[in-house]
Amino acid sequence: MAAAEAPRLAGMVVALQANFLEVELETFNPSSLVSWRRSTDAEPLRLLCTRRTRLDHRGAAVHVGDRVWVEAIDWQERRAVVGDVEPRQSWINRPPVANVTAVVVALAVKQPCFDADQASRFLLSAEQTGVDVHLILTKRDLITSDQLEQQLVRLRGWGYRPMAVSVQTGEGLGALKNKLSSTRLAVFCGPSGVGKTSLLNQLLPQLSLRVGAVSGRLQRGRHTTRHVELFRLCEGSLVADTPGFNRPELPADPRKLAVLFPEFDGQIEDYPCRFRDCFHRDEPGCGVDKSWERYPIYKRFLEEMECLSRSSRGGSGSGLL
C-alpha cells in the first residue's frame, strides 16, 4: 500500500527575509496547531519557510505575491517548506511583486512639489503592468480647496480619476480604503517623500512602519521602506509598500509609448495616421491631436529613448528601435 501523500497547503508569499520566505496561508486546520491561540484567529496564519532545491533546478524564482504550496509543516515552530509555485497572473519588475491586480501611484501636491515629468514616469511604469492604475494625491491639507480642484481637473485631463487624501486630517482615507478593498493585491509606488508609508500607517493602524523626512534642498524624501512586504487591508485584499525611488525607467519599446498615455485613447485605435508606425511627432499624415498638456512630455520621452537607442548601438544610426 502506498504511503499517504504529505499534506500541502496553499498560501501567498508576503515577505522575503534573507533566505526565508514568509507565507500567509489561505486555508488551514486550527486543530493541527499546537501553539495556536483563539485570541489570534482574526489574523491569518503566517509560516516562515525555506524552499525546495528543485525549484532552483527548475529556475523557479519565488517572490512576494507568488501563490505557493507549502509542505513539511511544523505547526509548533510555525515553519514549512515551499514545494511549488503557481503560474503568475501578472508581474512587476521594479519592485518585484507577483499577481498584482492594481497599482496605486501616490503623488504629493506639495512637499515635494508636484512634478509633471516625474509623475508621468511613474504613471507610464504603472500603465506598463496592464493592471488597473489608481492615482492618489497626498498631503491634500497643504493646499487650498481651489488649488486642489485645479489639480484634480488637470489630472482628469490626463485620463485619470484622482483621489485626494490627507494623513493629517483623515480626508479621503475612507474612500481610498473602500476602493482598495475591491482589489486582490494593490502595490503602492511613487517618489520618496510623498507619504506612502504614512498613508499605509493610517489605512492599517496595526502597523508601525518607519517614516522618513523630506530633504529640504532637493525636496526628495529619504527612502524609508527598504523591502517589499504585503499587509492585509481587509478579507481578500492585500496592499504592498515598496521602496521609494525618484526616477523610474521609461518603457523599453518606444513603439509602445503612445498607448501608455490615456490621452491617446480613441485617437490611435483606428490608425488615423497615414503610417501605422507613426510616432506622432512630425511625420506626414499624422492624425493625432497634439493640443493636450502632456504632448511635450511625450515628445521628450521619445527623444530620450532615441538617445538611449543610439548609445546602445555605439552611437551609429538614427531613429528609434
Curated annotation (Swiss-Prot):
Keywords: Cytoplasm, GTP-binding, Hydrolase, Metal-binding, Nucleotide-binding, Ribosome biogenesis, RNA-binding, rRNA-binding, Zinc. The lineage of its organism: Bacteria, Bacillati, Cyanobacteriota, Cyanophyceae, Synechococcales. One of its GO terms (molecular function) is GTP binding. GO terms for biological process: ribosomal small subunit biogenesis. One of several proteins that assist in the late maturation steps of the functional core of the 30S ribosomal subunit. Helps release RbfA from mature subunits. May play a role in the assembly of ribosomal proteins into the subunit. Circularly permuted GTPase that catalyzes slow GTP hydrolysis, GTPase activity is stimulated by the 30S ribosomal subunit. It comes from Prochlorococcus marinus (strain MIT 9303). The gene is rsgA. Zn(2+) binds at residues 273, 278, 280, 286. Binds 1 zinc ion per subunit. Its EC number is 3.6.1.-. Monomer. Associates with 30S ribosomal subunit, binds 16S rRNA. GTP binds at residues 138-141, 190-198. It is an enzyme of class 3 (hydrolase). InterPro entries: G_CP_dom, NA-bd_OB-fold, P-loop_NTPase, Ribosome_biogen_GTPase_RsgA, RsgA_GTPase_dom. It comes from the Bacteria. Gene3D superfamilies: P-loop containing nucleotide triphosphate hydrolases, Probable gtpase engc, domain 3. This is Small ribosomal subunit biogenesis GTPase RsgA. Belongs to the TRAFAC class YlqF/YawG GTPase family. RsgA subfamily. Its cofactor is Zn(2+).
